[in-house]
């Protein structure tokens, strides 16, 4: 890939304003590369290229042909897995082992949607005599994808992979904080045979390139993953052109632990659910609600686990890497400062290793106990490695606490009681409920999305293909 350029119409092109943005390594706070600063004219060129591809070779390709291209792309990603992981680790600060898992997930997304491309179909509907009625699913046309900095490869894979499988041409605006891996994948896509213009990448700031994409009249669908505040702006901009939007926003996801749960099985999952990616995960299990009878012993065990966590540079491959930037680091500090001021006890915290650069954006994982349900630590998304522990007396209180935020992305339930498992799964306000696990290993086959302030629409799995298509009804009268 070429530094400080966009990928438009199958070529590396300079930004219209010839300006760049520094790429900073979160592990030491130092710039190590540059990207192009895209603006509205760059988005205009990218949309035009996508329109040409949709009207030309990509739009004319059969579903089977699209699937074969995506399968080749999956193989290319797998062949370059270590390279992509190294790029992602340095760009985001995440430990190399996590970046490696993200690259493997990217390959799997392309593999899954390659196989699904020719399985998407409409229906024949029963109707009155003399008519044949059927539905067909057609691609929207040109789809816009605004990709966040926390999981660039994974979210690119689940969003763009599904859109391409459905026959759309794509314009992608990755986050300026972490977009190098996405640019490399665009290059691999061209090598895999994706026609020029079917995939276009414009880098830049959200308020410039992102806003231009969201309000562009040539976009037929927008997929956005990010904060609720920005998601609201994107939806408003898209509404100017009556463009449908898939929003995957924040979360304040609870894990409910009952006294009959297998605590040995739950413990490492409760920790990893908030520590993974430094807590910078929309579905992070940031609240643990514990039944009163086992609250003290479980909090004690959690504290022991947290005290053993180590934080360091991405290359050290420890439990946590740095946060993405100084702004995010300050946000986490502000939450912890408010908690301390309000007398919320910190039960434990991890350790930043001694050789971590002082200029890096480090934050040790923190466990806070007895967090009041109304406190901002229990209500707002921290987006950092901070776990809020709370207690409950019975199921009703557990559900009240779990549903007591504006969010509704993920919930976890830990209990051996089968009746309780299904009863609570139906009562919890969340797009995903995991029972005696959390995340189900991140399977690409599982539809993912939220309710409330966590957004709407679904990505991942076969369900995502419906969002990237428009349903058309055809009624034929005979005789």
Language-model features and meaning:
Residues 29, 66, 88, 110, ...:
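Residue-level signal for inorganic ion chemistry
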Residues 54, 58, 74-81, 85, ...:
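Structural signal for hydrophobic packing residues in well-ordered secondary-structure cores
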Residues 1-28, 34:
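Hydrophobic face of amphipathic alpha-helices that form TPR/SEL1-like repeat modules
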Residues 33-120:
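Glycine-rich loop-to-alpha-helix module at the N-terminal edge of alpha/beta enzyme cores
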Residues 229-372, 435:
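ALDH superfamily catalytic-core signature
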Residues 22, 36, 59, 92, ...:
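A structural signal for short, well-ordered beta-strand elements
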Residues 122-265, 317, 392:
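Rossmann-like NAD(P) dinucleotide-binding subdomain of oxidoreductase/dehydrogenase enzymes
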Residues 28-34, 256, 310, 355, ...:
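Conserved C-terminal structural/oligomerization subdomain of aldehyde/semialdehyde dehydrogenase
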């Amino acid at each position: 890939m070429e530094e400080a350029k966009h990928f438009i119409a199958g070529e590396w092109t300079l930004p219209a304003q010839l300006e760049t943005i520094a790429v900073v390594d979160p592990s030491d706070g130092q710039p190590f590369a540059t990207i192009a600063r895209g603006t509205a004219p760059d988005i205009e060129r990218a949309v035009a290229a996508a329109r040409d591809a949709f009207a030309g070779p990509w739009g004319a390709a059969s579903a089977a042909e699209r699937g074969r291209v995506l399968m080749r792309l999956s193989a290319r990603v797998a062949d370059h897995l270590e390279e992509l992981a190294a790029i992602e680790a340095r760009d985001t600060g995440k430990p190399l082992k996590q970046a490696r898992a993200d690259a493997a997930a990217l390959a799997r997304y392309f593999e899954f949607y390659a196989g699904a491309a020719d399985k998407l179909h409409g229906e024949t509907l029963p109707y009155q005599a003399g008519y044949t009625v059927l539905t067909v699913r057609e691609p929207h046309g040109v789809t816009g994808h605004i990709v966040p900095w926390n999981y660039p490869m994974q979210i690119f894979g689940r969003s763009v992979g599904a859109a391409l499988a459905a026959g759309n041409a794509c314009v992608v605006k990755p986050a300026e904080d972490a977009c190098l891996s996405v640019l490399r994948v665009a290059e691999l896509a061209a090598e895999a045979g994706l026609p020029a213009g079917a995939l276009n990448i414009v880098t830049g700031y959200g308020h410039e390139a992102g806003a231009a994409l969201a309000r562009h009249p040539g976009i037929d669908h927008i997929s956005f993953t990010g904060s609720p505040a920005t998601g609201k702006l994107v939806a408003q901009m898209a509404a100017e052109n009556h463009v449908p939007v898939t929003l995957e926003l924040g979360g304040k996801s609870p894990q409910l632990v009952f006294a009959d749960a297998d605590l040995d099985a739950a413990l490492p999952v409760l920790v990893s659910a908030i520590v993974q990616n430094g807590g910078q995960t929309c579905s992070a299990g940031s609240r643990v609600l514990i039944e009163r009878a086992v609250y003290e012993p479980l909090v004690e065990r959690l504290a022991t686990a947290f005290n053993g966590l180590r934080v360091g540079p991405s290359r050290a491959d420890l439990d946590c890497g740095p946060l993405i930037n100084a702004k995010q680091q300050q946000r986490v500090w502000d939450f912890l400062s408010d908690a301390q001021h309000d007398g919320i006890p910190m039960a434990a915290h991890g350790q930043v290793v001694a050789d971590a650069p002082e200029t890096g954006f480090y934050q040790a994982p923190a466990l806070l106990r007895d967090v009041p349900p109304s406190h901002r630590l229990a209500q707002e998304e921290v987006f950092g490695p901070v776990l809020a522990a709370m207690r409950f007396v019975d199921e009703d209180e557990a559900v009240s606490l779990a549903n007591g935020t504006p969010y509704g992305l993920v919930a976890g339930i830990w209990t051996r009681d089968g009746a309780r498992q299904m009863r609570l799964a139906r009562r919890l306000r969340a797009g995903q409920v995991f029972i005696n696990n959390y995340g189900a290993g991140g399977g690409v086959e599982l539809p993912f999305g939220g309710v409330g302030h966590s957004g709407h629409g679904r990505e991942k799995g076969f369900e995502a293909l419906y969002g990237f298509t428009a349903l058309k009804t055809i009624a034929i009268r005979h005789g």
